[in-house]
Amino acid sequence: IDYTSGTTGEPKGVEYTGRGAYLNALGQALDAGLSSTSTYLWTLPMFHCNGWCYTWAVTAVGGTHVCLKHVNPDEVFLLVARHSATHMCAAPSVLTMLEASRMVSEGALSGVKIFTGGAPPAPRVLRAMQSMGAELHHLYGLTETYGPSTIAAVQQDWAGMSIEDQARMKSRQGVPVTTLHVGVRVVADDMGDVPMDAETIGEVVARGNTVMAGYYRDPKASASAFQGGWFHTGDLAVVHPDGYIELKDRKKDVIISGGENISSVEVEKMLMEHPAILEACVVGVPDEMWGEAPKAFVTLRDGYKVTPIEIINFCRERLAHFKAPREVKFGPLPKTATGKIQKYVLREQEWSGHDRKIG
């Protein structure tokens, strides 16, 4: 039993099977290109999705584990150099810490395969990793799928693209991993596949040996999650003509303002392009005129100063005006033990005392 991290509410016990964990570990070894000469640096907590099964995957191929007691960006750079690390997994928040480290230099992570997931990485972070020589791979998955269920597999023809276009391609969630090659779909309400037009939004569903057996002692939640024989992730996505999936938002996180749907992820990506912003989170808050409106919660980089109106105008110049945050609040963001931002905590704070929530 492995517990979810609690980014959308109370953690739930996820029932794993030995077969599922075994197959996922082998799949991760194949997808990551692990071998007996691999050295894996741990920044991902081993308790989170069982370390995406890398605890077993690295061991199965005879690779080397290098463990961190606490995530310190400066120490990461030192250990990469000292142990000639070849692989590491890291949440987007860890990548942001590395980008902001005083030890950043061109080629500092040369030859290191970095796998990231948990939230769509900002294009700015992707560009920073590339400048340091890292080979960044974006994964998508949940505790319920033993970790990664898709990977943004890098294509050879991307090499000729600009860094901006490469970042855009790599920030997508990608195609199913080896163990779920026919088990991940994006479906409409009738469970039919959405067209591969990069526009039609559906829900990501999964089925296979590396999908959980159910929620521990919660048959109601298990039945709800497996409607139609597929596990419903609650994540909304489109499918591009090349078959790559791109998340647009979680069902719970879509902001409905004046009848318009706003993707909180889209606004967050734009906020992360601002040079002063280290981290950003956007939630819908009560609005008397529009029902709800986007509000941004941001953490600034050390030494930077910026006003809320400057951030709002930055977004208005690059997004449709109704998508730009109406408010901006500065300060640390609530996070889980794995470094994921807890949107529901911010949302509940903002909706406290209101009769209902919209969206």
List each language-model region with its residue ranges.
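Conserved beta-loop-beta connector loops within the AMP-binding
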Residues: 176-205, 241-242, 304-308, 342
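Acidic/polar alpha-helix N-cap and adjacent early helical turns
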Residues: 349-359
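Conserved AMP-binding A3 loop
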Residues: 1-23
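Gly/Ser/Thr-rich phosphate-binding loop
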Residues: 60, 82-90, 99-169, 178, ...
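AMP-binding/adenylate-forming catalytic core of the ANL superfamily
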Residues: 80, 88, 208, 213-214, ...
